[in-house]
Amino acid sequence: MLDLSVIIVTRNTCQLTCAAIESVLSGQDSPSREIILVDNGSTDETPAVVAKRYPSVRQFRSERNLGFARANNLAARAAQGQFLLLLNSDAALQPESLAAAVAWMRAHPDCGAAGVQLLNPDGSPQNSIANFPTLATELLNKSLLRRLCPRRYPGKEHRFTEPVEVETVVGAFMIIRRDLWDAIGGLDERYFFFLEETDFCLQTRRLGKRLMHLPQITVWHGQGQTAKKDSPAARIEYWRSRYIYFAKNHRLSVRLTLAIGLLLRLSANCLASGLLAALTLGRSARWKNKWQVNSALGLWHLRGKPQDMGLPR
């Protein structure tokens, strides 16, 4: 059995995907590993370029977008590694990242999965951990929560220097024990994009396994460059995933409170952003974009949350 299976899901991100693959192949003291790429219906040159440049990469091609969870599950079924690494196509490893992550997991068998410190292209830290979604995190301002209660809601302002147990990690780089993956059954395919790794972290904790943040390992991350191509669609997809997460993991009273609170806030945001966009005569890109996002979310709710709105399938 190989030490590690690196799984990358891509869609129309040829240059980013090649950079991610290059970073895996150029690792120092790398464990035995394989790279599995799932192409989620790319219409650019990604499949052909990867096949030509990296013949050792095992590639699965889909004619349509399977979603993040389903694509990773497809690759995992073919994976031969003792550990699985979910790596975003807009992430790039440091030379020592793979060796350090595998070594840490081997030395700590009580750890089921782990994430690392993600960095922006300029080297500044990204939020690499998060809390499980609750009424507080979803209805209140997250930045304010992090400032008022930094221990309860740590963010990128809190720089950890030692490995620490956390609730969830950002799935741009997430190393997972294969036996844990099999016990949970992989990622829940009801999530098309967003929160699938958060739900996996919750199931990890429920099985009594620790989930760790490893700040000593750093990875470059574009922070959702693929999703940013269609902001209203991405926000709709996030809201859909949030409803799925709460329906699966919270009681009815919490779900109702969430829905009422979100709709009240959305109504206020629609009114405010529409008014400010009008007052600036549409010249403010910020308020124009906010109005487009909020109105799209409002229309999605009015139409009954249809599947044909959101990220393309």
Question: Where are these predicted regions, by residue range?
Answer:
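Glycine-rich, basic loop-to-helix element that forms the pyrophosphate-binding segment
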Residues: R61-A79, A100
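Short aromatic/hydrophobic "clamp" motif used to bind/position activated sugar donors
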Residues: L84
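Conserved donor NDP-sugar-binding/catalytic core segment of glycosyltransferases
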Residues: A92-S128
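N-proximal low-complexity "stem/linker" segments adjacent to membrane-targeting elements
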Residues: M1-S26
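Active-site-adjacent helix/loop segment of glycosyltransferases
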Residues: I7, R206-G282
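A short, conserved alpha-helix in the catalytic core of glycosyltransferases
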Residues: T161, E165-T218
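A conserved acidic beta->alpha catalytic loop
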Residues: S23, D39-A48, R64, Q94
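Short, flexible, basic/aromatic active-site loop/helix in glycosyltransferases
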Residues: P133-E167
